Regions:
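Generic beta-sheet signal
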Residues: 73-75
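Short, charged/polar micro-motifs that form catalytic or ligand-binding hotspots
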Residues: 22, 29, 46-53
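Inter-motif core of Ras-like GTPase G domains
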Residues: 39-44
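A short helix->loop->beta-strand "cap" motif at the edges of active sites that frequently abuts
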Residues: 66-70
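Conserved nucleotide-binding/hydrolysis micro-motifs of P-loop NTPases
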Residues: 77-79
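Conserved TIR/SEFIR loop-to-helix hotspot centered on a Trp-containing motif
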Residues: 49-65, 81-85
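Conserved N-terminal substructure of TIR/SEFIR domains
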Residues: 1-38, 162-185
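C-terminal interaction surface of TIR/SEFIR-family domains
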Residues: 81-185
Length: 185
């Protein structure tokens, strides 16, 4: 089934996810697993701070592990009640990646903010093993070559779109279909 054939998609606001997280982490995980059951693609709607969310990273990781299509859509400037749009945040697919160990196995990794210069307080990023899935995995078919001993962000292998400048209302279903096709679905 193509995204363009789907009617009545279920959406959830941030408050639904956050309230579930505050009550019970296992309840939130169950809600998330049910929400994406039978999906072919995970479409990350990216705002100013989406890249920081543990739960967004979790769903990205599940998409990689389950070999589902993956894409990001910037929605920073879509909010109609905001007088000025937020500055675009990092693409969450840029802070999640895959690492190819010298033994040939692939692992999920995530970027963590670290202080790079104590005298100036300058921040940078470093790759660390993704704690919620430290086991090796088979990379999805859309992942290209990764040099052994190196990490590569998922954004190198996936599409990123801007909802407003690329007419997301018209094109989003096609973007999702393209991401699904990358994994043969």
């Amino acid at each position: 089934m193509k995204a363009s054939d789907t009617v009545g998609r279920q959406t959830a606001t941030r408050s639904v996810w956050e309230s579930r997280a505050l009550k019970n982490e296992s309840g939130l995980l169950a809600l998330m697993r049910e929400a994406v059951r039978n999906s072919t693609t995970v479409c990350v709607l990216s705002g100013a701070n989406t890249w920081r969310s543990r739960w967004v990273k979790y769903e990205i990781a599940r998409a990689v592990i389950e070999e589902r299509g993956l894409l990001a859509i910037q929605v920073d400037d879509v909010e109609p009640n905001r007088a000025t749009p937020e500055r675009p945040g990092l693409n969450p697919l840029h802070v999640m990646g895959l690492y190819q160990h010298e033994n040939g196995h692939y692992y999920l990794v995530e970027r963590h903010e670290v202080v790079k210069d104590l005298s100036t307080g300058a921040l940078g990023f470093e790759w660390r093993l993704y704690a919620d899935h430290p086991e090796p995995l088979v990379p999805p078919r859309y992942v290209g070559d990764i040099e052994m001993g190196r990490a590569a962000p998922l954004s190198l292998f996936t599409a990123e779109h801007d909802f407003l400048t690329e007419d997301g209302a018209t094109n989003m279903a096609a973007w999702i279909d393209d991401a699904a096709a990358q994994v043969g679905r």
